[in-house]
Amino acid sequence: MLAYYVVKFFSWIMCVAPKCLRNLTAAILGGIAVVATPKWRMQMAAANIQECLGVDKARAQQIAEKSLRRFGRMVVEVMRFPLLNKDNITKLVNVEGLEYLEEAYKQNKGVIIATGHFGNWELLGATIALHGYPMLSITRKQNNKYLSLIHI
């Protein structure tokens, strides 16, 4: 239960904090992610990046580390979701091809959107919902049942 309140409090802080503090927090969280990630996981990530992108080992390691550093920014962005509305989400997300969703939705058969687990994909669901489309996301339950109470 404590974790739930800590996350909610952190979310509130990130919602009221000035941009410079949010950027600092994101940088610190990203740095912690780099240091806290086990070496074997970083090596596996770099190997996968190297294979998929065809880059050399040094570049793959650089991309893996940059991805972890970006994680801090993503956490701060997610903590600010309570502030999102249809008007301001367009400053964060550039929507292209919404007409295809509209066309599929008008067929009244439902629409399934599959996405990869990269970047701040949580913004996709928020963006679509704020454009008036009903959303249902399928995710794994959190290990901490109280954290499952937090809806993004």
Language-model segments: what does each one mean?
Residues 150-152:
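Conserved small/polar residues in nucleotide/adenosyl-binding loops
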Residues 82-111, 119:
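A short, well-structured juxtamembrane/interface segment
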Residues 145-146:
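Short, flexible loop segments at boundaries between secondary-structure elements
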Residues 59-63:
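Membrane-interface alpha-helices at helix entry/exit sites of multi-pass transporters
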Residues 116:
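Active-site pocket-lining segments that scaffold enzyme catalytic pockets across diverse folds
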Residues 1-47, 51, 66-86:
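A transmembrane-helix-recognition feature enriched in membrane-embedded lipid enzymes
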Residues 120-130:
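Histidine-anchored nucleotide/phosphate-binding helix
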